[in-house]
């Protein structure tokens, strides 16, 4: 073990908050257009088998200032940009971003001199009481990983398994749920058994030699520097070695994990076809390192499980025996869990035919209620508690909207939260009175924190902050059931024709609003034209005609914009009264301003 002394910078909260908008003097719209064309060319060349052209195009991305700019912007605009790891350099101003681009140019031009910084390791608690290690690379290492990911992800999409949906562009949980549900509903296959597979520490235990074999294009010196850089735990100065696996927290780690597990679907299929089993039908589905295999008979299931173990052993992995099981779906009324959804077969009302059902597990509902109670017990202002509860509610609602039982569960959760909010407000109000009776406190609570909905007796909780802004409690009942959807054809999100098909599939799981907006604008930011689906960029709905000028909440008055910086730039242009910027956004069709207001702005500027 090596003991090294590190000088940790004491970072104040303000240092994380005051981050400059990304503006390095390069047209980022042009950067993304150039990058998308290069990535499409790489994907097409890979499909045609032209490896020489693939490597040439990938090298152009790595060597280009456009590629470096997109990589730095990806890290700077991500949520993890506030976590420095063991970085000693600052990464919050445009001057820092330009310096990082110069550093990337030096590393890529001479990779043999590159040395990765040790990882900063923290532990995140899991549901079962254990802890998941999260290793955070330095800013330089993250930007370098983002740069090489831009080059190799189009290649990886061409060799990916058809039924792999985790950490892939334009794929999501809906696809995995739809794949399993479609298999269970197949009357010809009549699947009765499921093999639930849980890999033991998948990301942390992959063999480094195997990673080196399956990862294309990245120089071996750089790849091995990432794998062998070691880690330092928080509140410790001891450098621990990394002998296996990739860091959980690295930008390129999910892609490397997918490259490692790709090929498992064909391996299982080949083993079952070569067996003497009379029924060879099976359906495979994988999301990251979680996977299930549906089979018609127990004999086929007993063939599939050893095939998985054999495939994983070559990669230095093994299954967790405690969580790897073979179940009979028909006899087991509880069914099986996959991605926190419960799948089972139930009889229809006529009791003659089995049908498949996707539900929300009771354990997930209990954990959700536990989190809400923990938030409500904190000593924070009511509007802050309200906003935190809304964030949890939205995440839960939009994740589980693919479950058949979502309507019933959301309705009961909404009523439960109404009661929790009432109890919390009642306790806070009761302390302000010495001998007030229940009726008086109840009247004060209902008049202060609840507003009536329509002409009925229903009320909606809301809180007014110190600035007089109302914060209403999100209604989870407003989230409608959305049927899961997927396609089993080989589609590469980086090829335009394929991305159009994938967008149409994803639109089926969107609300009617988003469907209309996507049909009009496509899955791109209205300002920078960045593909939001491929790059998994957080976006917001922007009112083309702002509400202050009479704009309405209708799909035709909405456009998708990157959360940062595009939406901030468009909104701030009105506040700053910048006529040139406003006219530019009007010409792009993402902003409408009344003519008299615009004329007044021009007049006021000319008077100065």
Curated annotation (Swiss-Prot):
GO cellular component: chloroplast
Domain Reverse transcriptase, chain residue ranges per copy: 105-343
InterPro entries: DNA/RNA_pol_sf, GrpII_Intron_Splice-Mob/Def, HNH, HNH_nuc, RT_dom, RVT_N
Signal peptide: none
Pfam families, per database record: HNH (PF01844), RVT_1 (PF00078), RVT_N (PF13655)
Main subcellular location: plastid
EC number: 2.7.7.49
Cellular localisation: Plastid, Chloroplast
KW Plastid (keyword) present: yes
Top-rank EC class of the record's enzyme: transferase
Cell cycle as UniProt keyword: no
Catalytically driven reaction(s): DNA(n) + a 2'-deoxyribonucleoside 5'-triphosphate = DNA(n+1) + diphosphate
An example molecular function term from Gene Ontology annotations: zinc ion binding
Domain HNH: 525-571
Keywords noted in UniProt: Chloroplast, Nucleotidyltransferase, Plastid, RNA-directed DNA polymerase, Transferase
Descriptive protein name: Probable reverse transcriptase
Native organism: Tetradesmus obliquus (Green alga)
